[in-house]
Amino acid sequence: MALHDENVVWHAHAVTREDREALHGHKGAVVWFTGLSGSGKSTIAGALEEALHKLGISTWLLDGDNVRHGLCSDLGFSDADRKENIRRVGEVANLMVDAGLVVLTAFISPHRAERQMVRERIGEGRFIEVFVDTPLATCEARDPKGLYKKARAGELRNFTGIDSVYETPESPEVHLDGEQLVTNLVAQLLDLLRQGDIIRS
């Protein structure tokens, strides 16, 4: 810990998370999408956000590529940088949950330890891990950004699923078949959010 930590004290605010949730009419939570590149994380997260918005739910979508344009623009793809990337995203997501939002995150987040770190930061009941399980062959066939082709050609190192490991979730709240229709997957997620009392029926 830094030497100045003892002088940094958390400042509590008069307006609480519960106050903000009451204003929004729903609980704050994180829906954490994890899976290989091309698995469909961003597509499903975007469709879910659209569906939630239509229901009057206050949301925010944190996307893996987007945060690297600003918040994490100084980070690369080493194990240490990936860990820091997820730590920062977890902290931002936690602030947004405190604001009463339903936060959707779409990150490969290949390591269980980092996902567990965010889970512990957010708290049980507010962290919903969604494993988008799509076969590597399907992800490669989709290859929307041409990254698998570059990785296979040796032009891109430390690419998850090719020469960098992806640790599949052991007990995610939701296990989605990434080859199914997005509309069906969104319906499944909405049901889960209702059952978890995150959003109203």
From Swiss-Prot:
Record keyword Transferase present: yes
Pfam families per record: APS_kinase (PF01583)
Signal peptide as annotated in the record: none
Recorded GO MF terms: adenylylsulfate kinase activity; ATP binding
EC number from the UniProt entry: 2.7.1.25
Entry annotation: catalytic residues: S109 (phosphoserine intermediate)
Presence of the UniProt keyword Phosphoprotein in the record: yes
GO biological process, one term: sulfate assimilation
Pathway connected to this protein: Sulfur metabolism; hydrogen sulfide biosynthesis; sulfite from sulfate: step 2/3
Highest taxon, organism lineage: Bacteria
Binding site for ATP: G35, L36, S37, G38, S39, G40, K41, S42
UniProt keywords, alphabetically: ATP-binding, Kinase, Nucleotide-binding, Phosphoprotein, Transferase
Protein task: Catalyzes the synthesis of activated sulfate.
Family the entry assigns: Belongs to the APS kinase family.
Protein name: Adenylyl-sulfate kinase
